[in-house]
Design a protein with these regions (language model features):
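Phosphate/nucleotide-binding beta-alpha loop and adjacent structural elements of enzyme active sites
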Residues: 1-241
Length: 241
C-alpha cells in the first residue's frame, strides 16, 4: 500500500514540479550547473534535475540511514549519475552535533523535529496514512551526526552554487544558518516550508524570509503543495540578477 501512496503523491505533485523546473530554467541560462541537495531522500530531486538540466555536479545529503540505503541503491542502478553525483549519509544543520532523528513510516516525512501528536493536522494526516500504512507513525528514533553546510562545502572549493535545495521537514532555517558566508556563492535557494503545527519547528517562515533578505536574497517564486499546508519557495541572490 505504501507504493500506492507514493504513486498518488507523485501524480499530485507532478504539475508543481513542471512549473518549478520551467521557472528555474528561465533563471539559470548557463549549463552545466552545480546543485547542493540537502534532504535527498531516495533521489527524487536528483532524478528531476538530471532529466531537465545539464549537470556538472550534485552533492547530496541524507540524514536517515534507511533513506540513504534507498538513495545509494538508486545511484548504483543509474550509471550515468555515478560520475556527477556524490551522496553523503550525514545530517546538515547549524553546527556540528549529534541529535535525535525521527524515522517515519512514511519515509519522506522523517525529521529532526519533534511531532505535535495533539495537532489537528497530525490527527487528520494519521487517518489518511493509516489507510496505507501499518504500525506507528514514528518507526524509530536514533541519534544522527550533523555538520554545518559551510564546513562540508569547504572540501569541494566551489566558486558558485547554482541551486541549493533544502527539504528537511522543519530544519530548513538550521541548514541555512549553518551555511554562513558561503551563502553569497549561491544563486537560487529552493526550499519548502510547513505552515501546519504538526512539526514542532523553532522558527517561522517570516524568520527564514528575514534571514535570506539580510543576505541580499529576494523571493521570486511561491507555490502551494496540493493537499498540504506547505508551500515551496525559490529565493534568488540579487547579486546574480
Amino acid at each position: 500500500m505504501i507504493f500506492l501512496l507514493k504513486i498518488l503523491f507523485s501524480v499530485i505533485d507532478n504539475q508543481n514540479k513542471k512549473k518549478i523546473i520551467f521557472f528555474i530554467k528561465k533563471k539559470l541560462k548557463s549549463d552545466p550547473i552545480v546543485i547542493i541537495d540537502v534532504g535527498a531522500h531516495a533521489g527524487e530531486t536528483i532524478q528531476l534535475f538530471f532529466k531537465n538540466f545539464l549537470i556538472k555536479k550534485i552533492i547530496s545529503y541524507e540524514a536517515s540511514k534507511d533513506n540513504f540505503k534507498k538513495l545509494k541503491n538508486y545511484i548504483n542502478k543509474n550509471h550515468k549519475l555515478k560520475d556527477i553525483v556524490e551522496i553523503n549519509n550525514i545530517g546538515i544543520g547549524k553546527e556540528s552535533s549529534t541529535i535525535k532523528f525521527n524515522q517515519m513510516s512514511e519515509s519522506s516525512s522523517s525529521t529532526f523535529c519533534d511531532i505535535n501528536f495533539e495537532s489537528r493536522y497530525f490527527k487528520r494526516k494519521k487517518k489518511i496514512l493509516n489507510f496505507f500504512l501499518k504500525g506507528d507513525f514514528i518507526n524509530k528514533s536514533e541519534l544522527i551526526s550533523i555538520r554545518s553546510l559551510k564546513n562540508e562545502l569547504e572540501k569541494y572549493q566551489l566558486k558558485k552554487i547554482d541551486i541549493l535545495k533544502i527539504d528537511t521537514e522543519g530544519f530548513e532555517l538550521n541548514v541555512l544558518e549553518g551555511l554562513g558566508d558561503k551563502i553569497k556563492d549561491v544563486k537560487l535557494i529552493y526550499f519548502e516550508h510547513h505552515f501546519d503545527n504538526m512539526i514542532m519547528k523553532n522558527y517561522t517562515y517570516t524568520m527564514i524570509h528575514s534571514y535570506l533578505s539580510k543576505f541580499n536574497f529576494k523571493k521570486v517564486f511561491k507555490i502551494k503543495m496540493p493537499l498540504r499546508k506547505t508551500f515551496e519557495y525559490i529565493y534568488q541572490n540579487k547579486n546574480f540578477d
